[in-house]
A protein has these predicted regions:
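Conserved HGGG/HGGXW glycine-rich cap/lid loop of the alpha/beta-hydrolase fold
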Residues: 9-83
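Acidic catalytic loop of the alpha/beta-hydrolase fold
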Residues: 243-247
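Short glycine-enriched nucleophile-adjacent loop
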Residues: 121-132, 138
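Alpha/beta-hydrolase
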Residues: 153-227, 234, 254
Length: 301
């Protein structure tokens, strides 16, 4: 793992595969550190012909935290939005999208394929909308468009993610297992020990719940991306589980309908996670998409 200065931040990142291969930038979801992209999954993508780049988003992991901005008061944000139609937040999804683009700049990569899950899917959508000339293809996994008319998350899923903060490693592991039972896949084997191990690794590496709150505020402030998605002219794959209780599958259908020419992959039995049993299908879908176009030669950093 390495650090690099980009977009006035210190960004922690990691790579898999050969630099000459197709560049593929992976963007994790709300509060998720880059290690949530399993190394074996990343290696499968590398073996499929990609130069895989995973990184910590701002405010999580080992990338710059925004602690001096405090913790958002979501009740105040709702009132502000209802009153003014906009909200003031520490940073926006557009800022988070620029982080990824700036990372590509510093790595000397002119164009890249991008793939994001959940919040990461929203971020890659913002990348494609704002920096279309830099994007070769977009894969949006278990994400949505910001359409306010779509069904909300299941109350139990929201409760699971907004429950009391963890205060020790054991609590972190136990909570991860409980959350997995509520929002995770039922059509695939659940590896409880793997969930515990990953939760412990994340807790010990960098536990920052205030950063998660600031990321959530960025989501609230971003609004509807459909007008921008309608203008995209790039290969796009939308992947979603049919039983996702946190971001309902209607978000996938809405994304598919609003990105011209997008492909849709609905995985039966998948919830709001990426179970190991679905990796091969996901990797195959991404590889098929990225084969539709090729990157320019990386420029000098």
């Amino acid at each position: 793992m390495s650090k690099i200065k980009a977009n006035s931040l210190t960004i922690e990142f990691d790579t898999f595969g050969e630099p000459e291969a197709k560049p593929l930038l992976l963007v994790m979801g709300l509060g998720g550190q880059m290690i949530a992209w399993d190394e074996n999954f990343c290696q499968q993508l590398a073996d499929a012909g990609h130069f895989v780049i995973r990184y910590d988003n701002r405010d999580v992991g080992l990338t710059t935290h925004f602690d001096d901005h405090g913790v958002p008061d979501f009740k105040e944000l709702v009132v502000e939005f209802m009153t003014n139609g906009t909200v003031k937040v520490p940073y926006t999804l557009d800022d988070m999208a620029m982080d990824g683009i700036s990372l590509l700049d510093e790595l000397g990569i002119e164009q890249a394929h991008i793939c994001g899950v959940s919040l990461g899917g929203m971020i890659v959508q913002a990348m494609a909308i704002n920096h279309g000339d830099r994007i070769l293809s977009m894969t949006s996994i278990m994400s949505t468009t910001g359409n306010p008319d779509l069904p909300p998350a299941h109350p139990k899923a929201i409760e699971a993610l907004t429950s009391k903060r963890v205060d020790d490693p054991k609590h972190a592991m136990d909570r991860a297992v409980e959350v997995s039972k509520i929002i995770g896949s039922t059509g695939f084997e659940r590896d409880e020990q793997r969930i515990r191990n990953k939760a412990l690794e994340s807790y010990n590496r960098a536990y920052n719940p205030d950063g998660v709150a600031r990321q959530m505020a960025a989501v609230m402030a971003h609004g509807d991306r459909r007008p921008g998605l309608n203008q995209l002219k790039l290969p796009c794959l939308v992947i979603h589980g049919d039983i996702d209780p946190l971001v309902p599958v209607t978000g996938a259908h809405d994304t598919h309908q609003n990105v011209p020419g997008a492909e849709l992959m609905i995985i039966e039995g998948m919830g709001h996670d990426m179970p190991k049993g679905a990796w091969s299908q996901i990797v195959k879908g991404i590889a098929s998409l990225t084969n539709q176009t090729s990157a320019t030669v990386p420029r000098d950093a």
